[in-house]
Structures are given as C-alpha cells and as structure tokens.
Curated annotation (Swiss-Prot):
Superkingdom, taxonomy of origin: Bacteria
Stored InterPro entries: AlgH-like (IPR003774)
Listed Pfam families: DUF179
GO cellular component, one term: cytosol
Family: Belongs to the UPF0301 (AlgH) family.
Source organism per UniProt: Haemophilus influenzae (strain 86-028NP)
Xref: HAMAP family: UPF0301
Protein name per Swiss-Prot or TrEMBL: UPF0301 protein NTHI0415
Amino acid sequence: MMELQGKFLIAMPHLDDYFNRTVVFMCEHNEQGSMGLVINQPTDLSIAELYSKLNFMMKNDRTFGNEMVVAGGPVHTERGFILHKNTLNAFQHTYKVTKELSMTTSADVVETLGSTFAPEKYLVALGCSSWGAGQLEKEIRDNAWLVVSSNDQILFDMPYEDRYAAANQLLGIHPYNFALAQVGHS
C-alpha cells in the first residue's frame, strides 16, 4: 500500500470537475480509505468572518490577517477541519497526521484562533475530500493525481493562487508543460 498520509496530491490537468488545478493535503490514508483537504481553493469567507458567525466572544486581542477559509472538498461541506502545527494544547477531537501536523474538528481549536493560544500555523477548511478503500490508488494509477512530499511553506504561507504551480515545481514540473502535452490530443 502506498504511503500517502502527509503528502500532497496534485490534480492532473484533465480533471475538469471540482478538483481542477487543486492541491490536496492528505490527512489520512489506510485500508478503509483516504481523506484530505484541498489547500488552494479559498472561499469568500475570511477566518475573521467565520469566527464572528460562530458567535464566539470577539476579544480585542484577536488578529486574523487576510486568511480565508478554504473549500476543503465536496464532502461534509458544513463541517470545519483545522489543519495545524502540533501544539501543547490538547483539543477535544484532534488526529495526528504527521510528526509536526494535526487535524482538529472540534470548536475548541477555533476558540483559540487569532489569539496567542492558537497553533503557530493553521489552515481552516469547510468540507473535505474522501475516497473509499482502493479508490484513490486506482485514480493515481489512472494518472488523475501526482504525489509529492508536502511542504509547510506551500501549505500555510503561500498565496492560494500560487500553490498549484509551487506543488508542481516540487516535482520539477512547470504547469505550462501540461498544456503542451495536450496539444494534438482530442
């Protein structure tokens, strides 16, 4: 079984549906199936707006910057998933993804966002991407996805619109090359 947890999946150009030009960070991969978060499709909802919609007490010491909530995938689109650097804080529903990263689905992590108690780096997603047993492996064999080691700079710090090209460049691929490969094929 291939080891995909903690890796990026890069959508091949022929994926023309929800996953067109996406990068997915894989949070879980085992015999039962796979789950990940699209990291480069921002919604029009900022983290600050999400925070206020959830009716958390807005405190003066909260700063959110320009971070947006991303559309993590077409499954459970009403649920929040927070991918973050590991912390000393114990959140209620946290799953360790890698040595450095965890995913939390409980509101207690949201309560810390924008404060000094927040994880050092985090990505807030609504929805996730999931595959049944063997489904993702088949899609990879069918050349729907490229797999590459993840990179914290791409995951947390890079502008959303640059993440697809940057993930491809981890493999030495310029996305323009895909367009050339499609010429003459119908």
